[in-house]
Amino acid sequence: MTVYLLAGGGTAGHVNPLLAVADELRAREPGSTILVLGTREGLESRLVPARGYELLTIARLPFPRRPDGAAVRFAPAFARAVGQIRRMIAERGIDVVVGFGGYAAAPAYAAARRPGVPVVVHEANASPGLANRLGARVAAAVGITFPGTALGPRAEVVGMPLRREIATLDRAAVRDAARAELGLDADRPTLLVTGGSTGARSLNRTVVQVAERITATGAQILHIVGGAQEFTDPGVERYHVVGYSDRMELAIAAADLVVSRAGAGALSELTAVGVPAVYVPYPVGNGEQAVNVRGVVAAGGGIVVADADFTPDWVLAHVLPLLSDPAALARMSQAAASVGTRDGAARMADLVRDAVAARPSRPAARR
């Protein structure tokens, strides 16, 4: 049976597609062994074991951005990680390395080269990260979420691998039950605000200032502030604050409109099930979130606003009227669904299994 090593992690944007592909591979090949490579500090340390997979860990290795002491220490630390992963490959008889970006992916790509283990890469964002740019050079196959992502001639659009809870979600059928489980009223317009697994300080700061104005119209808010953020609940009626949600499918099903960052994972989940959204791209980094959102905005399924412009006045002028306009929300929902995909995990699993089938035979694992 096949032994898979899935490498990635750090945030939900890396962990969720990894778990979606793991679940798809396990469903197709129940006797296979699926190992996950990550770090102790990342979200994977909690989510991977909870999903029933074995987590192997290496030290967290951020790529250095400046020629300083961290850059000097990086090379030997990276070499140690590569050696550690090579031993894992030999001892566990790993047949393929599947990388999703993040701290664990780059050394896994490097480690797979010498023993001739095929590498398959999935890139979530429209603008690829450094680890996956390196991995794509040696990969047998590359899956991308967005058309036009520059990862070489082997890149194939597969969409975002989504957890089954999202990929099979029927919002209309479960909306009332989702609202009940989340402690929300069944019949009120519902705004979901989320900044991702670590939260978004600027979104939190703005929304808390206008929460009372929004709920005064009869609407309700579910605000996921993020586990890494300090936040004081103001105690406004119908303003529900939670730190983090492991059941985002419930939150998405409950929502009429979402305010969100434009990370590839969140965007792909919302478009897959046709949820209208206001996207506020993260203003730091390589700008990938602003690129991610172009397709859904062009289709009419979302609105984009710069982080600096996402002010209380902007929310009252744009979000509040939209939340009370069911016809506009219905049009946006249909447009969002037109650019979403639900079968990314299956298509990515096809790439992985094809790479395994094409690999040359290798010696058995050491026992």
UniProtKB/Swiss-Prot annotation:
Record-level GO BP terms: carbohydrate metabolic process; cell division; cell wall organization; lipid glycosylation; peptidoglycan biosynthetic process; regulation of cell shape
Keywords per UniProt: Cell cycle, Cell division, Cell membrane, Cell shape, Cell wall biogenesis/degradation, Glycosyltransferase, Membrane, Peptidoglycan synthesis, Transferase
Record-listed E.C. numbers: 2.4.1.227
Binding positions for UDP-N-acetyl-alpha-D-glucosamine per the UniProt entry: T11, A12, G13, N125, R163, S197, Q289
Chief location of this protein within or outside the cell: membrane
Presence of the UniProt keyword Signal in the record: no
Membrane topology recorded in Swiss-Prot or TrEMBL: Peripheral membrane protein
Pathway terms, separated by semicolons: Cell wall biogenesis; peptidoglycan biosynthesis
Uppermost EC category: transferase
Compartment(s): Cell membrane
Cysteine pairs bridged by disulfides in the record: none
GO CC aspect terms: plasma membrane
GO molecular function: UDP-N-acetyl-D-glucosamine:N-acetylmuramoyl-L-alanyl-D-glutamyl-meso-2,6-diaminopimelyl-D-alanyl-D-alanine-diphosphoundecaprenol 4-beta-N-acetylglucosaminlytransferase activity; undecaprenyldiphospho-muramoylpentapeptide beta-N-acetylglucosaminyltransferase activity
Family as reported in the entry's similarity comment: Belongs to the glycosyltransferase 28 family. MurG subfamily.
PANTHER family: GLYCOSYLTRANSFERASE (PTHR21015:SF22), UDP-N-ACETYLGLUCOSAMINE--N-ACETYLMURAMYL-(PENTAPEPTIDE) PYROPHOSPHORYL-UNDECAPRENOL N-ACETYLGLUCOSAMINE TRANSFERASE 1 (PTHR21015)
Role: Cell wall formation. Catalyzes the transfer of a GlcNAc subunit on undecaprenyl-pyrophosphoryl-MurNAc-pentapeptide (lipid intermediate I) to form undecaprenyl-pyrophosphoryl-MurNAc-(pentapeptide)GlcNAc (lipid intermediate II).
Protein name: UDP-N-acetylglucosamine--N-acetylmuramyl-(pentapeptide) pyrophosphoryl-undecaprenol N-acetylglucosamine transferase
Lineage, broadest ranks: Bacteria, Bacillati, Actinomycetota, Actinomycetes, Micrococcales
Gene that specifies this protein: murG
